Amino acid sequence: MLRFARSLYPLILSVTKSDPERGHQRLIQTLKKVDTMHRNGFAVAMEQLEQAFTHADPRLQQTCWGLNFPNVLGLSAGCDKEGEAAAVWPALGFGFAELGAVTKYAQPGNDRPRLFRLPQDQAVLNRLGANNEGAVAMAAKLKHTWDYYPRTIPIGINLCKSKITPLDQAVEDYVFSFQTLAPVADYFVVNVSSPNTPGLRSLQESDELPRIFAGLQSANHWQKPLLVKISPDLSWEAIAVIIDLVKEHNLSGIVATNTSTRRSGLKTKILPQTGQPIEQEAGGLSGQPIRDRATEVIRYIYQQTGGTIPIIGVGGIFTAEDAWEKIQAGASFLQIYTGWIYGGPWVVSDILQGLGEKLAAGGFSHISEAVGIDTIGKAPE
């Protein structure tokens, strides 16, 4: 049945192309139904997902920050904004999942349409605006989930500033969300790089960033791993400053990268849903167009740190080759979202199986041995 579904997946993508946000909402609702069925004693749906989409390989397991990752491929933030399908992501093969972005205050996000697929470019343009129900609502939802399910994969939460919060009050906003959600998650990512919250990306290059890091660490009584997610559009100099701040404030890692506001080289010239030139459309671009830049940023961070700061690599991962490239550049972990949309849920097991083949071909006994091998010995850029 699932093989038949895979053959139909391109048709499903085509049917949902005109309103991808509604299609995504239906996906999340379907996964919620699987969760509900499991809680009500009908475990067969969850078991079928596990059989179809998981790929166990001890060579791909990682231990980091005191957490055990069944494999190195995780779900990127932006997919499960509310944590509604948190219990189901392990059955779809992910080694970890990052929920959110979540803000202190509930917010509706930007006006629709705000999510667009660019199939010619294997990309997605989004200007959702961190629509979510707020930190308190997510905490209650996740507590209810974990009261029923034991966590089998690490769960991260992407923290973003509320739109209504002034930039000079960002510290308190992030700290509130962190303290509210710390009991129900394993690691946290400070999102200062989304292009869809006005002024947010300016925090990456302002005096507020060290204050945010310091405020979060002061509140981190749980000793949760704190990471920062950066933009692919930053200069090398700006990235170097962030690396220094990560070291100074003892952050646990860097997520590289978020979406891009650049539009160069796209095959899509006009956005069909609006009729406007793509260069004039606001939002963050993800998928294949940012693959190479994301890898360059990973390589730069690895070079500058000598591999001492774990990197979660994200941006344009569609195949095992894409994943392997980022591992070799210096990523210890990977995240996928746009590639999962275009390739379907089979992509996770395909990539994991392909990584295992890469390890065998290269004579590696474990994925950690391959991290940064294409970067080691090269002079920093």
From Swiss-Prot:
Cofactor note: Binds 1 FMN per subunit.
GO cellular component: cytoplasm; plasma membrane
NCBIfam families: PRK05286.2-4, PRK05286.2-5, pyrD_sub2
Lineage, highest ranks first: Bacteria, Bacillati, Cyanobacteriota, Cyanophyceae, Synechococcales
InterPro entries given in the database record: Aldolase_TIM (IPR013785), DHO_dehydrogenase (IPR050074), Dihydroorotate_DH_2 (IPR005719), Dihydroorotate_DH_cat (IPR005720), Dihydroorotate_DH_CS (IPR001295)
Membrane topology: Peripheral membrane protein
Top-rank EC class of the record's enzyme: oxidoreductase
Active site as annotated: 194 (nucleophile)
Record: residues binding substrate: 81, 126-129, 191, 196, 258-259
Binding site for FMN: 77-81, 101, 158, 191, 229, 257, 287, 316, 337-338
The protein, known as: Dihydroorotate dehydrogenase (quinone)
Organism: Synechocystis sp. (strain ATCC 27184 / PCC 6803 / Kazusa)
UniProtKB keywords: Cell membrane, Flavoprotein, FMN, Membrane, Oxidoreductase, Pyrimidine biosynthesis
